[in-house]
């Protein structure tokens, strides 16, 4: 059932958004307001939001800037962090857009996109693979063109006014951008999908396989059609003010290859060389190294902890890194993300690397979980068993154990109220999930 913007910006709905999504958050914008402070004036703050939105007077505060490395010789990704009040408003807008228009969009998680690619490769229908990367995608989205797209979807004028306010806000006072959607906002992804929807529709053709995940495009087609299809996508992108990386055999950004040649997409390597023909899908070396470095960092932290060194904490963090977890009813972690690989040789090598790290640091390997077993459990849909921690089902005793590991205190010496333990537990879990997500944050 569709909802309008007036139904979205009610006191009760905004309060529910705050309590569900942000009440335990420790992230702050430029005003440094935490939920602890916001909660003291929660009712008044929410009433102010409702009033200002109703009269089209709501203004966003400039965003805090966070830079995320994309690797050597690359400009970092610029992430916008809104204030708590703005995050509530943005989440409400996102909910409005998702509930009303998501059925008109083809939004997929990377794993499903990868399964579709695998299926099409195995069909034997195609001869050529075209991989296209859009340059500076989010910073290049033209606002007036985006507004036209939103209007064509039927987005209400009051919602468009709010969206324009949000995307024109920058990192400096009085900044009024006309181009670019800040990355990191809860509305960024759905706006990008709506912006690209017309290209997706025009590229839909029964004679080709077309897949786009944000700014990464993969097309499978016949050899004779490849140049024309490539030029068509380039033309349509240019019409939206977007530029693509030019076809360059020496680059991995945009390429046109025979379908049996090695190529990468969404962090996966297809037809990897020089492995044998039994391996169809592996992962990029950079993705593998990022995971290995994160595991090695756990042992380094353990070695440097001195008197606070805890094998229990090391085992907990290490096994969590290896298997991933279930939290907030979602599968999280490196192996869940790359669950479509069939490169068991690589996983055996990584298990062996972890074993050697244990030996080097005099840590018993017996209690360490295995990537090779975890991938088997995932592929056979057995990840609901005890091999993977399901934090949603943890009882109070288990939560207390996690908090005690993290603080280096025996559970019986932990002097916290039940609510404090609950808050501390989810703060730890969210911290570890964010840390795991950095292992897969850059796959394009």
Residue ranges and their predicted role:
Residues 119-214, 218-242, 246-262, 307, ...:
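Conserved polymerase palm-domain catalytic core
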Residues 51-74, 160-171:
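Reverse-transcriptase-like RNA-dependent polymerase core
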Residues 2-62, 69:
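A structured, charge-rich N-terminal accessory region that forms the first stable segment of a protein
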Residues 266-444:
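Active-site and adjacent loop segments of nucleotide-processing enzymes
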Residues 32-36, 44-50, 119-120, 124-131, ...:
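Charge-rich, low-complexity segments
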Residues 76-105, 177-205:
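Conserved pre-motif C helix in the palm subdomain of viral-like polymerases
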Residues 4, 89-142:
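Active-site-proximal segment of RNA-dependent polymerases
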């Amino acid at each position: 059932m569709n909802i309008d913007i007036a139904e979205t910006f009610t006191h009760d709905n905004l309060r529910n958004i705050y309590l569900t999504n942000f009440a335990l958050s420790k992230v702050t914008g430029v005003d440094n307001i935490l939920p602890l402070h916001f909660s003291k004036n929660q009712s008044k703050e929410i009433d102010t939001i409702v009033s200002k939105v109703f009269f089209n007077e709501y203004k966003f505060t400039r965003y805090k800037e966070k830079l995320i490395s994309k690797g050597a010789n690359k400009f970092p990704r610029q992430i916008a962090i809104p204030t708590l009040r703005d995050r509530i408003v943005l989440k409400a807008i996102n909910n409005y857009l998702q509930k009303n228009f998501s059925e008109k969009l083809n939004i997929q998680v990377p794993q499903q996109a990868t399964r579709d690619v695998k299926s099409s490769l195995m069909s034997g229908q195609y001869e050529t693979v075209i991989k296209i990367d859009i340059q500076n995608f989010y910073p290049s989205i033209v606002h007036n063109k985006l507004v036209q797209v939103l209007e064509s979807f039927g987005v209400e004028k009051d919602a468009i006014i709010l969206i324009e306010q949000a995307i024109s806000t920058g990192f400096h006072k009085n900044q009024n951008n006309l181009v670019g959607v800040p990355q990191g906002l809860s509305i960024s992804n759905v706006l990008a999908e709506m912006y690209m929807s017309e290209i997706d529709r025009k590229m839909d053709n029964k004679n080709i396989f077309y897949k786009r995940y944000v700014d990464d495009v993969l097309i499978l087609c016949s050899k004779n059609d490849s140049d024309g299809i490539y030029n068509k996508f380039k033309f349509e992108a240019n019409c939206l003010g977007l530029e693509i990386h030019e076809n360059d055999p020496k680059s991995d950004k945009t390429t046109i290859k025979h379908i049996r040649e090695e190529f990468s997409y969404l962090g996966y390597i297809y037809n990897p060389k020089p492995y044998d023909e039994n391996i169809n899908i592996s992962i990029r070396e950079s993705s593998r190294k990022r995971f290995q470095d994160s595991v090695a960092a756990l042992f380094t932290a353990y070695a440097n902890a001195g008197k606070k060194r805890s094998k229990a904490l090391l085992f907990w963090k290490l096994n969590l890194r290896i298997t991933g977890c279930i939290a907030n009813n979602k599968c999280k972690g490196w192996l869940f993300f790359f669950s479509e690989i069939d490169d068991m040789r690589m996983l055996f090598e990584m298990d062996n690397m972890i074993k050697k790290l244990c030996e080097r640091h005099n840590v018993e390997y017996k209690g360490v979980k295995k990537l090779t077993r975890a991938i088997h459990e995932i592929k056979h849909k057995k990840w609901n068993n005890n091999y993977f921690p399901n934090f949603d089902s943890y009882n109070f005793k288990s939560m207390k154990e996690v908090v005690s590991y993290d603080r280096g205190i025996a559970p019986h010496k932990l002097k916290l109220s039940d609510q404090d333990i609950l808050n501390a537990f989810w703060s730890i879990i969210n911290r570890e999930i964010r840390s795991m997500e950095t292992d897969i944050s850059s796959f394009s």
